[in-house]
Amino acid sequence: MAKVQYMGTGRRKEAVARVRLVPGEGKVVINKRSAEDYFGLETLRFIVNQPLNLTGTKGKFDVLVNVHGGGFTGQAGAIRHGISRALLKADETLKGELKKAGFLTRDPRMKERKKYGLKKARRAPQFSKR
């Protein structure tokens, strides 16, 4: 077990990510798989790496993530949120740029509930005049 590690919890939609930052060479491990294996899309890997690229800490920390719930986009957002919070614990001076980029803010947008009488949250059944 590493002597120095920084923890952060990130959330987005239904996804929850528990992130550990350990001084290392920049490996990202998500649910015991590499980020390249876990996220097929390049955009999702980009979202995960945004806080590290912004703060210039890309090669300084190994990122160990446990994430569950939600879909791939929600999980990527949760991981970004968790990494940002862990970086803040590692170095308080990064708060300004992380906050300005919006990485410390929990995205409040959630799925809207389905209403009775409708097919989905807002989609009404087809209407026929005659």
UniProtKB/Swiss-Prot annotation:
Q: Which keywords are on file for this protein?
A: Ribonucleoprotein, Ribosomal protein
Query: Per the record's keyword annotation, is Transmembrane included, yes or no?
Result: no
Molecular function terms in GO for this entry? RNA binding; structural constituent of ribosome
This protein's record includes keyword Ribosomal protein: yes
Kindly state a single biological-process term from the GO annotations of this entry. Answer: translation
- Gene3D superfamilies, alphabetically? 3.30.230.10
Q: Which residues lie within the region annotated Disordered?
A: 106-130
Matching SUPFAM superfamilies? Ribosomal protein S5 domain 2-like (SSF54211)
Per the record, its GO cellular-component terms are: cytosolic small ribosomal subunit
Tell me, what's a Pfam family for it? Ribosomal_S9
> Where are stretches of biased composition, namely Basic residues?
111-130
Q: Which domain of life is it from?
A: Bacteria
PANTHER family linked to this entry: RIBOSOMAL PROTEIN S9, SMALL RIBOSOMAL SUBUNIT PROTEIN US9M
Family according to the record: Belongs to the universal ribosomal protein uS9 family.
Q: Which NCBIfam families match?
A: PRK00132.1
Its protein name is: Small ribosomal subunit protein uS9
Annotated organism of origin = Clostridium acetobutylicum (strain ATCC 824 / DSM 792 / JCM 1419 / IAM 19013 / LMG 5710 / NBRC 13948 / NRRL B-527 / VKM B-1787 / 2291 / W)
